[in-house]
C-alpha cells in the first residue's frame, strides 16, 4: 500500500470508536466500535469493504486494552500494517494547556489525566485509550487532537464568566467550548464552497446532533461558542438541558434532590427526551409530531427556536457574515429542522432554496438558502472529524 493511513481512536468510558483514515482523501477504509465495556456483553464490531463483522470481548475488565490489542491483529490481517503512519486520539478537553494538536509522550498523557476534573467522563477514558495504544503500537507516533483547541482563539470577553475572578484563577472556570474539530473542518469546507480564503471568511457553524453547539467563526478563528465550561450549556440537546437558570439547581437541592439526581436529570433526562416525554432522537420527535404528539411538537419548537436565537446573537461577534453552516447528524439530514430554524431567522432575509435544501441530505452538501440583505448563504457541510485528526497527525510527523 502506498497510501498514508492514520488509525483514529476515540476512547469513551465504556466504548472505543476507531477508524483507519486515508490522510489525503479522508475516506474511512476501516471503521469500527467497541461497546458495553465493563459488562458481560462487551463486544467489538467493524466494517471493511461493505462487510460487517462482530466478535465478543471476553473478561470483565481491561476491555479498552483488549480491544486495541485486537486492532493490532485486525490491521495486520487486512494489510494495513505498512500503510498506517500514525495514531490520532480524539481527546475532549485540553483546558488552556493544549491549544493545538500535540505529539503524545508520558508528560502529555499525564497532563490529559490532570484535566480530568474538567471532563470526568471523557479525559480518563481518553488517557486509557492512549496508554493501551502506546503499548499495542509502540513503534507508531501518536498524537492528541483536542475538542477544545479550536476555541482557544476566543477573546476574553467571550470566554470570561461574569463570576468572581477567583473561580477562574483558582479553579479554571471559564468557557472552553467543544465540537471544535467539527467546527474547524466545516468552516474550511464552507470557505472552499464559496470560493473565499478561510482567513477572510466569517461563518456561524451549527453542529446539531445528540450533542449540539453553535460557533461564531471570524477570519477562520473561533470567537465564541455556545457550549461552556462543560458540554451541558448552550443549545437544547438530545438529553441535555442547555442553558438553564443556575438558581434551579439550588431550588431542587432544597426540595430534597441529591446532587447526583439533579445532574443526572440535566444531563440525561432533559432536552428532546425531557420536553417530549418520549425520546431523545430527533427522528422520533419528527415522527411523533406528524402524528400530533403535543410533547414532540413542543420539543421541536423549543429546539429550533433556541438554535435560531443563538445564530442571531452571534452576528454580534462578527463584522459580516458569509454563511450559516449546518452539520452533525441532525444538521446534515433533517430537512424540517433546518427549514424551521431558517424560518425563525426570516428577519435576516434568508430565503430557502427548496430544491437545494431537499438535496443536501444523507452525505450531500450544498447551499440551501440565501440572504440578499446580508449577502450570505446557508449551507450544509457533512462533518469529518476523523479526517481532521488524521490530517493534523500527519502534519506533525
Curated annotation (Swiss-Prot):
Cofactor: Mg(2+); Mn(2+)
Cofactor note text: Mg(2+). Can also accept Mn(2+).
Binding locations of Mg(2+): 10, 385
Intracellular or extracellular location(s): Cytoplasm
Active site: residue positions: 147
Biochemical pathway: Metabolic intermediate biosynthesis; acetyl-CoA biosynthesis; acetyl-CoA from acetate: step 1/2
E.C. numbers: 2.7.2.1
Binding site for ATP: 17, 207-211, 281-283, 329-333
GO biological process, one term: acetate metabolic process
Major site of localization recorded for this protein: cytoplasm
The reaction(s) this protein catalyses: acetate + ATP = acetyl phosphate + ADP
Molecular function (Gene Ontology), one example: ATP binding
InterPro entries: Ac/propionate_kinase, Aliphatic_acid_kin_short-chain, Aliphatic_acid_kinase_CS, ATPase_NBD
Keyword terms, alphabetized: ATP-binding, Cytoplasm, Kinase, Magnesium, Metal-binding, Nucleotide-binding, Transferase
Site label Transition state stabilizer, positions: 179, 240
Annotated Gene Ontology cellular component terms: cytosol
Annotated binding of substrate, by residue: 90
Annotated family: Belongs to the acetokinase family.
Assembly behavior: Homodimer.
Function summary: Catalyzes the formation of acetyl phosphate from acetate and ATP. Can also catalyze the reverse reaction.
Protein name per Swiss-Prot or TrEMBL: Acetate kinase 2
Species: Aliivibrio fischeri (strain ATCC 700601 / ES114)
Amino acid at each position: 500500500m502506498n497510501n498514508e493511513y492514520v488509525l483514529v481512536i476515540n476512547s469513551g468510558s465504556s466504548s472505543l470508536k476507531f477508524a483507519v483514515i486515508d490522510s489525503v482523501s479522508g475516506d474511512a477504509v476501516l471503521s469500527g466500535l467497541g461497546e458495553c465495556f465493563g459488562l458481560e456483553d462487551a463486544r467489538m464490531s467493524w466494517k471493511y469493504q461493505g462487510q460487517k463483522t462482530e466478535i465478543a470481548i471476553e473478561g470483565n475488565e481491561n476491555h479498552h486494552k483488549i480491544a486495541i490489542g485486537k486492532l493490532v491483529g485486525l490491521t495486520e490481517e487486512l494489510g494495513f500494517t505498512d500503510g498506517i503512519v500514525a495514531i490520532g486520539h480524539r481527546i475532549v478537553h485540553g483546558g488552556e494547556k493544549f491549544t493545538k494538536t500535540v505529539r503524545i509522550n508520558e508528560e502529555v498523557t499525564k497532563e490529559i489525566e490532570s484535566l480530568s476534573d474538567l471532563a470526568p467522563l471523557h479525559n480518563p477514558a481518553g488517557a486509557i485509550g492512549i496508554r493501551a495504544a502506546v503499548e499495542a503500537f509502540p513503534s507508531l507516533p501518536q498524537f492528541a487532537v483536542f475538542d477544545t483547541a479550536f476555541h482557544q482563539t476566543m477573546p476574553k470577553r467571550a470566554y470570561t464568566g461574569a463570576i468572581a475572578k477567583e473561580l477562574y484563577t483558582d479553579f479554571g472556570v471559564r468557557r472552553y467550548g467543544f465540537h471544535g474539530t467539527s467546527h474547524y473542518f466545516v468552516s474550511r469546507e464552507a470557505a472552499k464552497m464559496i470560493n473565499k480564503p478561510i482567513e477572510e471568511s466569517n461563518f456561524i457553524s451549527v453542529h446539531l446532533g445528540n450533542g449540539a453547539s453553535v460557533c461564531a467563526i471570524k477570519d477562520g478563528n473561533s470567537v465564541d461558542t455556545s457550549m461552556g465550561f462543560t458540554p451541558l450549556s448552550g443549545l437544547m440537546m438530545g438529553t441535555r438541558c442547555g442553558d438553564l437558570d443556575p438558581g434551579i439547581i439550588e431550588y431542587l437541592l432544597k426540595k430534597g434532590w441529591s446532587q447526583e439526581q439533579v445532574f443526572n436529570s440535566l444531563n440525561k433526562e432533559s432536552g428532546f427526551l425531557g420536553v417530549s416525554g418520549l425520546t431523545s432522537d430527533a427522528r422520533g420527535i419528527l415522527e411523533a409530531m406528524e402524528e400530533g404528539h403535543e410533547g414532540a411538537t413542543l420539543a421541536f419548537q423549543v429546539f429550533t427556536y433556541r438554535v435560531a436565537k443563538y445564530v442571531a446573537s452571534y452576528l454580534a461577534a462578527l463584522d459580516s457574515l458569509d454563511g450559516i453552516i449546518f452539520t452533525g447528524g441532525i444538521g446534515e439530514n433533517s430537512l424540517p429542522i433546518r427549514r424551521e430554524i431558517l424560518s425563525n431567522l426570516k428577519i435576516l432575509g434568508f430565503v430557502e432554496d427548496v430544491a437545494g435544501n431537499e438535496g443536501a441530505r444523507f452525505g450531500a452538501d450544498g447551499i440551501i438558502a440565501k440572504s440578499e440583505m446580508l449577502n450570505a448563504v446557508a449551507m450544509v457541510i457533512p462533518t469529518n472529524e476523523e479526517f481532521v485528526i488524521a490530517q493534523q497527525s500527519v502534519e506533525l510527523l
